Amino acid sequence: MKLLYTDMSQDLTEILTEQASSYAQKGKRVFYIAPSALSFEKERKVLEYLPQSASFDITVTRFTQMARYFILNTSNPKTQLDDTGLAMIFYKVLLHMGDDELKVYGRLRKDSNFINQLVDLYKELQQANMTVLDLQHLNQVEKQEDLVRIFSAAQDLLLAGDFDNQSKLSAFFKEITSGHLDEALSNTVLVIDGFTRFSAEEEALVALLNDKCHQIVVGTYTSQKAYKANFVYGNVYQASVDFLRTLAQTYKVIPDYVTTDKEGNRSFARISRLLESRHDFSTVDETVTEQDKHALKVWEVVNQKEEVAQVAKSIRQLLADGKRYKDILVLLGDEESYKLHVGQIFRKFDIPYYFGKEESMSSHPLVEFVDSLERIKRYNYRAEDLLNLVKSGLYGGFAQEDLDLFEYYVNFADIKGRHKFLSDFTANSRDKYNLDQINALRSQLIEPLDKFLNSRKQKGSSLLKKLVVFLEAVQLPSQMFELSTKASEAEKEQNEQVWKAFTHILEQVETIFGDESLSVDDFLSILRSGMLACDYRTVPATVDVVNVKKYDLIQPHSAPYVFALGMTQSHFPKVGQNKSLLSDEERSRINEATDEHRRLDIVTQINSKRGHFVAMSLFNAASEQLVLSQPQIINESQDDMSVYLKELLDLGIPLVEKGRNRFEAKGDQIGNYRDLLSTVIALNSSHLDLDLDKETQTFWSVAVRYLRKRLDKDQVLIPKVIDDVTTTKVDDQVMQLVFPEEEPLKLSATALTTFYNNQYLYFLRYVLELEELESIHPDARHHGTYLHRVFERVMGDSSSESFDDKLEKAIAQTNQDQPFEILYTEDQESRFSRQILEDIARSTASVLRDNAAVKVEREEVKFDLLLANSIKITGIIDRVDRLTDGALGVVDYKTGKNVFDIQKFYNGLSPQLVTYLEALRQTYKVDADQLFGAMYLHMQVPQLNLAQIGLEKLAAQAHKELTYKGLFVSSETEHLTGGNYDLQKTVTYDKEDLETLLDYNIKLFRSAAEVIRSGNFAINPYTEDGKSVQGDQIKSITHFEADRHMGQARKLLRLPKKGKKEAYLELMAKTEEENQMQVSENTISFPVIDHAVRVDKKDQEDNHVD
């Protein structure tokens, strides 16, 4: 064995390539061994350094692949299993074990994560040259017994099924030991590069090959100073020094320090020496130079998006300077959080890149198909799982319109569970749904699915056949073909890989579970676990791309230009964590009890020295320039600076703040056309003249003209970011169809409230007639109708029975009404809602029972009022009461808390009670002095705070809560005193005030009708304070944003509380000429006010449909 080491300023791969080439010239077969994750990059570099750029005698590979070259022709009839196959073996083993057989892991028998941990431990034991019997000294004896039982059963199953149960290196090891390869190995030379440690399996193999091979050359990076030091703990080269010293001691070899004639980058060499001296507590007579500051830069950026954008701009500048994409390497501290940003921004900058990370197949439609299939069975036909299956694009050739109809109905009827999906759908809403069509669709969707999922427990081979029949019935193969015909080349390749993985899993299921009795649940669970564990294999489309990968795989001299992103404390250095079934303490005790070349890795013990070596490799990764960048905000949280970056700053490397001046007009900051375009769009053009000098203004003016020409040439339309949300006039033909001119405009109190809430909300509901998603479950509307019906029956019962008996009879009769019986017996939740409603009816009824001074005149009174032959006001009054003096009043039942607020009324948001009084006045042909008021009766159980109310006052306070609240005529209050009426001064009005309210209410209707007839509906939700919006913004449709569009909101007129009623009445009483409401496109002005107003909530207080 020959051991070589060199400084990181030297290129070790070049040195080892010369060694390999010299042995090849002597007729030796050379294997150049690199770590698995680096074999591709090593092969490329070795080929570059070979004098002839290629050699048949030198093979760049990894340990496991090298073994195949020697044992490829060796007969091995055993079936090979990959990780998915091993997982199936463990699944089968655990399937035959009961919970009581495994004392620690009994509850995890079918947990896919636990099975994956078993697979990882199985492979780790192979790499450690151990068996499960070596797992002694665990924290729990029961844990050891469980693992021995599981692994022993798995080993028996592998042997019984004639599966290959050893790794490639183990098979190679056996062939070497047998002596069959002595002749071939005697002419073989191994050159090992890129390692700072061997696994136990690799270590044993190297020891064996050292006696058989012609030569083994091992090279690594360290300094002479570090290797010769007596104390290396904490040294930046501790990992490689320990590695070298162990090999030197084992094989009695003195390592040689080697160099080349080529001098590396002096700046990186100097920085490496300075860092080394900081960690070995020595001093060097060197300082950082200006050249060093140019070669190594430390950036600080606000966030990840800006960080990637700055790197992209620098890459575009390097290209402008004549560099190639392949000369640039981008390293990531956290791959997952940067993947999306890198993809989006590099595409914007037209930078081709290769992300060297396997991508999960989990988002592919076929994987979603299998996942949904398993979840449907596991959760007994949960609606969301079944809808995901049929909407995967691979389930039958159904039209999208049919699938949308099916989904809409399932959500409406709340279909859950196998029984409901197999039964005919019967629920309907005003005959809105074509049940024959929907049930025919249900049969086509559910029948083939249920036929497969309802299969009894049987052999795996039989279930596979039934699965194939099911897949053909739902046309999965043809749908996959159809999916590929519309796909891009990259997507076609992905589809091919997914299909290959799917069929491979089915083959392994046939092999392992063919004769095993399986339930459909277990069968689908196996398929799902296998598919979710699959990854896409990615290969760069061309060599000339920017390589992107995680930084901890970096090697010195990887590329001329290197950008390392996300170098924060959390990710640089990376701290390895133990996530296996064995703790660090257990691993340590096992290692102490085993002999040489048998060892479990303890990741946490090597974190420090591994972190130092990776950092030094990163600092020497570039041959020209290295940029280390850290964002202040990463993964939406603030992170501190890495200790390694702090060390660089202490050495004198300056911290460069990037992205502070995003719109600086420098040629080397533009990058490319798309970036310039996005920058111009982002600029606020109204501030250009204020913020930029004349020269910069000229630059941007020219740039904008250039961009406009490019946009026109390429026919590119840029979505505008608008600061207002405007609407266009509704077509006259549409208005004539919805609101014919020859007919009066129909309005109700609810429609009027909607209009003054937000004009556009009225347009959606009453012009387009859009509806919210319905549900078969009762809601506030149904609850209100139920209580209406109860009280209607109670008040209409003229029998001699007691009031309480009448009430109970009314509740029983209402419960038996077919609509309510269906609604309130659907499930436990519905029955509970009915129970609450019955309690509310009994609580509220006490108000009706004690109201002797009032006689119920009529109930459910429909009215149509005609205003000037142009407006028809419609509605239903819940109850009309008559006092003993003949005065009439209105009662409206409410399930929520409502009061008459004159401020809301003035602003058009509470016209209901006044509208009902107008209906009484015109229907009964009475004057205002013959009305006693309009009020709400809140149908609810009083809720009292027992901490604030004593028991002696509890009954009185509860009774007080059950009162009529609204507006009352002051002259009639003497007849109401002592009853359940809230007669505060602020809600009592004399005859003249009531006339004012009635007249102003008509003005509200007329003003609204004028706007509606015009066809101009503004997006103007109301605001009470001008700072926040209370009206319905309908954001998903209008894109209204309070912070940007507050100017279009309708601001309500708010007056001080003192004298509020009188002030509003005075405003209403002004002559119509002085107080005419002017309704424009964006504002609705009210008397003596000219503000904009807005709305955000649909007023659903009216519990019946007008």
From Swiss-Prot:
InterPro entries: ADDB_N, DNA_helicase_suRexB, P-loop_NTPase, PDDEXK-like_dom_sf, PDDEXK_AddAB-type, Restrct_endonuc-II-like. Disulfide bonds: none annotated. It holds the Pfam family ADDB_N. Transmembrane segments: none annotated. It is an enzyme of class 3 (hydrolase). The keyword Nucleotide-binding applies. Keywords: ATP-binding, DNA damage, DNA repair, DNA-binding, Exonuclease, Helicase, Hydrolase, Nuclease, Nucleotide-binding. It comes from the Bacteria. Coiled coil: none annotated. Its cofactor is Mg(2+). Its EC number is 3.1.-.-. Signal peptide: none annotated. GO terms for biological process: double-strand break repair via homologous recombination. The heterodimer acts as both an ATP-dependent DNA helicase and an ATP-dependent, dual-direction single-stranded exonuclease. Recognizes the chi site generating a DNA molecule suitable for the initiation of homologous recombination. This subunit has 5' -> 3' nuclease activity but not helicase activity. Belongs to the helicase family. AddB/RexB type 2 subfamily. Heterodimer of AddA and RexB. Despite having helicase-like domains, this subunit does not have helicase activity. This is ATP-dependent helicase/deoxyribonuclease subunit B.
